[in-house]
Amino acid sequence: MSVPVPNLRGLNPAPVTPFTPDGQIDFPAIERLGSWLGTFPEVTSLVVLGHAGEGTFLTQSEQVAVIEAFVASTAGRVPVVAGITGEGTKVAVEEAQRAVDAGATAGLIYPSHGWLRFGFQPGAPQDRYRAIYEETGLNEILFQYPDNTKCSYDLDTQLEIAALPGVHYTKNGVRNMKRWDTEIPVLRQAFPELTIMSCHDEYLLHTLVRSEERRVGKECRS
């Protein structure tokens, strides 16, 4: 069963997961942070459990609780995007299903972090995205990692992932403006409806000025 496709054309802040001094999740702080971000009309989603949200440091039950808390912070009005970080495909599918059940409407699909050092077999990323959508219906964001890692997708891989059902967005953090300037136009031409999001700190102006669309996912602290 597919999840309704949210329009993420706007600002997509990535709030941190706040903690109490004794290391517990600070749910009142989540309510304050999420409800405040939800007051801005430019904010089209809250991206949780990514790098800023420390999703990989949380237990499964904590991940679910964080998603539910951010959904509740805006009474479901602002879509919640959940980072999907599980290493194996089956693990990622199960994580994505928990995210759907908790109220997430899209997933930021991380590459398997085992690929960071050793790279990936051809077709493995495509299988990851395909399985997640086919088994959970979660809308997917193609996550392009920095160029200096071994899990940065070549253009052909990006095009093949973007062509898959359920992939409606790409968050690009390639951090190589030669690749941005040559690959983004190809993606845009091949998939005019693909929402292109920049997460470049050091190249933010470049990626906004040269993009027809103004979208960015940034860390947000309470």
Features from the language model and the residues they span:
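Conserved small/polar residues in nucleotide/adenosyl-binding loops
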Residues: 213-220
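Active-site/binding-pocket entry motifs
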Residues: 17-18, 203, 222
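Residues that line or immediately flank small-molecule/substrate-binding pockets and catalytic motifs
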Residues: 15, 50, 111, 174, ...
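Ligand/cofactor pocket segment of small-molecule handling proteins
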Residues: 106, 114-119, 125-210
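Active-site beta->alpha loop and helix N-cap motifs at the rims of alpha/beta catalytic domains
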Residues: 2-152
